[in-house]
From Swiss-Prot:
Family: Belongs to the metallo-dependent hydrolases superfamily. DHOase family. Class II DHOase subfamily.
Residues that coordinate or bind Zn(2+) 2: K100, H137, H175
Cross-referenced PROSITE patterns: DIHYDROOROTASE_1, DIHYDROOROTASE_2
InterPro entries the UniProt entry points to: Amidohydro-rel, DHOdimr, Dihydroorotase_CS, Metal_Hydrolase
Keyword check for Zinc: yes
GO CC annotation: cytosol
Gene that this polypeptide is encoded by: pyrC
Subunit (UniProt): Homodimer.
Name of protein: Dihydroorotase
Cofactor comment: Binds 2 Zn(2+) ions per subunit.
Names of required cofactors: Zn(2+)
Length: 347
């Protein structure tokens, strides 16, 4: 087994960078490894149009480390009021690559999200016409639905209908967490794909709940049982172009996580590819990591793969116990624990 692994530079097809004083920290972490990233638009207020997307993009570019060529790929936040013209203008910009469906109340800063999917059908029709991708947070939010069942119910009640109604629309089912989602994506047309996070590959709900509640494992969609984790590992390491890397790295300040009502999100960007390497190594599938991390995503988005490379070295190191987050701190996933792979830094 080799102690070095060289890959075409990967991309992150789902990340939260936040805004303001934290950007120099979050952008540096993602730019260290990834050539491009799909930037989530759930700011306050959200990124609803091309003008707001461009302003956010400029703030991200300004926060890049010196010499960085990292490219943010921008996303619109769909609301009940999103118009076909909003979509066409965003597509024409050249820097907006997708629009995101957040069911209202499903996750962090989703209060402005879609209250009924029927209300965005005109926008979805325009997206299909111009070739803009739909990114989906696939959970229902009704109070009577168990939090562990929200993804499956969303598939049955909404996602099947969208895919059937708009067969030419490219859809990314983001951060899938269940065997049900894997099956749906595998059985759907070539226009349907999914991202999978490192934390959903490495962990299940026992890690979060057994022996005490561990708030830094709390994310949405929530970690599921081990059988679903196994299904995700099967999908990620299958070699199928329908599955690719999306960290859903989502930082919150330490006090907002370690709280009686803590926020959802795991911060993984500081060591994302290293964490994925651990998951793939567990399956003796390191030969499949480059496809998942560097090739499948660009192919689905219709973009070229990166041409430069990164190298991972089998070399244990200890994750930091905390990281700067503006004037506050963020506790990364695996804080203070040993990681088995290290990204080789080039001078």
């Amino acid at each position: 087994m080799s102690d070095r692994l060289t890959l075409l530079r990967p991309d992150d097809w789902h990340i939260h960078l936040r805004d303001g004083a934290v950007l120099p920290h979050t952008v540096a972490d993602v730019a260290r490894t990834f050539g491009r990233a799909i930037i989530m638009p759930n700011l306050v207020p959200p990124v609803r149009n091309a003008q707001q997307a461009d302003a956010y993009r400029q703030r991200i570019l300004a926060a890049r480390p010196a010499g960085s060529r990292f490219e943010p790929l921008m996303v619109l936040y769909l609301t009940d009021q999103t118009t076909p013209e909003d979509i066409r203008t965003a597509k024409a910009s050249g820097f907006v690559h997708a629009a995101k469906l957040y069911p209202a109340g499903a996750t962090t800063n989703s209060d402005s999200g879609v209250t009924s999917i029927d209300k965005i059908f005109p926008a979805l029709e325009a997206m299909a016409e111009v070739g803009m991708l739909l990114l989906v947070h696939g959970e229902v939010t009704r109070g009577e639905i168990d939090v562990f069942d929200r993804e499956k119910v969303f598939i049955d009640e909404h996602l099947r209908r969208v895919v059937e109604r708009f067969p030419t629309l490219k859809v990314v089912f983001e951060h899938i967490t269940t065997g049900d989602a894997v099956q749906f994506v595998n059985e759907a047309s070539a226009n349907v794909a999914a991202t999978i996070t490192a934390h959903h590959l490495l962990y299940n709900r026992n890690h979060m709940l057994v022996g005490g509640i561990r708030p830094h494992f709390y994310c949405l969609p929530i970690l599921k049982r081990n059988t679903h984790q196994v299904a995700l590992l099967d999908a990620a390491t299958s070699g199928s172009g329908k599955f690719f890397l999306g960290t859903d790295s989502a930082p919150h300040a330490q006090h907002a996580k370690e709280n009686a009502c803590g926020c959802a999100g795991c911060y993984t960007a500081y060591a994302a590819i290293e964490l994925y390497a651990e998951a793939f190594e567990q399956r003796n599938a390191l030969d499949k990591l480059e496809g998942f991390a560097s090739l499948h995503g660009p192919a689905f988005y219709g973009l070229p793969a990166n041409q430069d490379t990164i190298t991972l070295v089998r070399d244990e190191w200890t994750a930091p116990t905390s990281l700067p987050f503006g004037e506050l701190t963020v506790i990364p996933l695996r804080a203070g624990e040993t990681l088995r792979w290290r990204l080789e830094e080039h001078a």
